[in-house]
Each structure stands twice: as structure tokens, then as C-alpha cells.
Amino acid sequence: LLTQLASQDMDGKSFEVKGTAGSAANLRLLSDHYIELGIAQADLIHDAYYGTGDFKNDRLSGYKAVASLYAEACQLVVRADSSIQTLDDLQGKTVCIGEEDSGTERNAKQILEMSGLTDQIIDTVNLDYTNMAKQLESCKIDAFFITAGIQTTVIEELTRRCDIRLISLDQKCINKIQSAYEFYTEYTIPANTYTGQTEDVHTISVRSVLLADTSLSDKTVERLTKALFD
């Protein structure tokens, strides 16, 4: 719907949907004017604007915020038969932290860092959503992180192939992360969000924001916001 509305104001040019590695990639593509619309996490938008964090000495510009969309929960998934019950149990395990240059990777690294879980303690790998689910199912990895709106499709689809559990972050970890990084909000994934999930899961979240190239007309941006909120 959004792409259809936007294309009406672009002199007959249609938008093409592109798959990317995630937030950081979208910000760079917007800044280089390769894409005209993209979604990114608020924490990465902040760093890209100020040239901090993952964008140290690499300030990006050329895009504007259109709307805050929804909370993206940092979700840690294991097989139901796994011995992993807490973050500390990841020691000595193989953990997928998402694709390179993605918001998931950044969030996972910060959670692990705040929990004292360095690369010397756990083995981290980079995989896309589809392959992380496949490798957890086949026991090639022990856990994966994914930052996304809840009722995440890839997680729910995985429940149809094997039993899984979501791991809660302990309150000490949540407090420490919130103190260090202002964009994180404490978040609860309600019981029964996923098949077989019988208890609430406690974690953190970041906001997802719709961005547009600065060259996109105000009229088009107005149509986009109306489509979202009217």
C-alpha cells in the first residue's frame, strides 16, 4: 500500500522492494541515494547521524524520519530441548547474532558484552533469518538472536518444525543495558505470542523508524503518514 501511494507522486515511476541486511545497510543505502524509503532502528539512526558507535567517524545524511512504527524486541531463541536457560548458559555455545551490518548484530553484541560474554567465551556466527532458523533446527547452532516486531514470522514458522523456547534477559542485564544505551526500553513478550510459549519473556526493545530520502517530496511523505495513521 505504501509503495503504491508513493508511486502516484513520482511521475509514473514505481517503487521496487529490495531486501537488505537490515538497519545499518538501509541507512547507508539511503545516504548514498540508492533507495528512497527504508526502515531502521532508532539506535542506529542516532549513531549514523552523530557519527558514533558503529558509525564512528562515518556520519551519514541525506534522509529524513517519516514516522516511528513499532517496537522491535530483542529475542533470543533456543531449542526446547536445549540446556540453555539463561544468558550465562551461552558460554561455550555457538550463537548466531544475525547478518553482518544488521541491527540484530549490534543488539546481540551489546547484550553479550553487558553480560560479560566475549568472543573468547562463546562462538558467534553471522546468518540471515532463514538460515539461522534452519541451523537451529538441525542443531548446527545452539541459539540465535533476532531483533524484530513480535510474532516474528521466521520464529513462528520454526515452531512448526521443532519445539523452541525464548530466553528472558535477567533484570540486572536489562538495567545495565538501559543505563549504557538510552534507546533500549524494557519489554515483555506476552505468553502465547508463539506456539508453545507458555510464559512471558522479559527482554528489551528498540523503536523501528520509517525513513525517506530527502529528495522525496513533502506531498509523498504526507501520503505515507496518512496511510500509516489515518
Protein language model features and the residues they cover:
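Bilobed "Venus flytrap"/periplasmic-binding protein-like clamshell domains
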Residues: 1-17, 68-138
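Extracytoplasmic
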Residues: 10-12, 22-25, 32, 60-63, ...
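Short amphipathic alpha-helical coupling segments at ligand-binding clamshell hinges
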Residues: 217-227
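Pocket-flanking alpha-helical
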Residues: 3-4, 16-57, 132-135, 151-158
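Pocket-lining segment of extracytoplasmic ligand-binding domains
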Residues: 42, 52-53, 82, 118-211, ...
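A structural signal for short loop-to-beta-strand junctions that line the ligand-binding cleft
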Residues: 56-69, 74, 193-202
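Soluble non-cytosolic domains of exported or imported proteins
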Residues: 20-24, 39, 99-106, 127-130, ...
